[in-house]
Design a protein with these regions (language model features):
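Structured mid-to-C-terminal alpha-helical surface segments
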Residues: 1-17, 26-38, 42-266
């Protein structure tokens, strides 16, 4: 509820904001992990301008009894090109929720088009409107997560431990359709952007490490299947392998769990 009320205010200031991260998956009914962050960005806008708009939005009274306090920003530890701002939400004088807003500017690399989705929580109040959000393209969401799992981190080039990304890819694979051509383009573009050479078959950088880490992350999630790494790889490989080797055609069918050519492309 608090996320939605802050986002509603933000869209009243500017309607070009894009919701990313776990909140975007939640808005698509694809989320299986809890989050205390709202990840947003606006193209063609510096982070400083974006922060000013966020603070302006938080101060608006739109008749829903919510008020917000925005704390001091800090640089994101995993990505120095973003800000994190703590937020406290109140109803009247009572504290309601505390979360963070991760704020990006115009550096984001996007292949697809942002998509409109309904509001997270429906509010039934006289004269209170909900307009929904624009969310990060799903093909770019997948591309980001795939690339992040292959990227090396730190000065020593440590392998990725982003187990949560594999949890999210499993959730997307079993519930969402993906267009092959655009998804291939998004993955290749993201790999180029990060300076990565991706393999033609999906795997994780360290089977033993990821076996333990993924099982912990999946155990905390709402995934209905794939609680072990082997099970997760069995679920995502039919989707990701044809994307990585460029042979995927048509659309990913989450029910059949295979790439299906349309009648126009057969």
């Amino acid at each position: 509820m608090a996320y939605d009320r802050l986002l509603e205010r933000l869209y009243l200031v500017d309607n070009d904001w894009i919701v990313k991260g776990a909140t975007a998956l939640l808005a698509r009914d694809l989320a299986v992990r809890a989050t205390i962050d709202v990840d947003v960005y606006r193209q063609a806008s510096s982070r400083e301008i974006a922060e000013a708009e966020l603070r302006e939005a938080a101060g608006r009274d739109i008749g829903d009894w919510f008020t917000f306090e925005i704390g001091e920003r800090r640089t994101l530890s995993e990505a120095a090109d973003g800000f994190r701002l703590p937020v406290k939400a109140f109803i009247g004088t009572a504290a309601w929720a505390a979360f963070h807003v991760d704020l990006g500017g115009d550096e984001l690399h996007v292949t697809g088009e942002p998509e409109a989705v309904p509001a997270l929580a429906r509010v039934v109040m006289p004269d209170v409107e909900q307009h929904g959000y624009l969310v990060y393209p799903l093909v770019d969401h997948v591309a980001d997560k795939v690339a992040a799992m292959f990227e090396l981190y730190g000065v020593d080039g440590a392998p990725s431990t982003r187990y949560k990304d594999l949890v999210d890819v499993v959730a997307i694979t079993i519930a969402a359709s993906l267009p092959a051509e655009l998804q291939i383009t998004a993955i290749q573009s993201e790999a180029t952007h990060r300076g990565l050479r991706l393999p033609e078959r999906f795997t994780v950088p360290d089977l033993q490490l990821w076996g333990r880490g993924y099982a912990r992350e999946a155990g905390r999630s709402l995934l209905p299947i794939a609680r072990t790494l082997d099970e997760a790889l069995a679920v995502v490989s039919p989707c990701l392998d044809p994307l990585l080797d460029g042979t995927a055609r048509g659309n990913w069918d989450p029910e059949q769990r295979r790439w299906v050519k349309s009648s126009l492309t057969e």
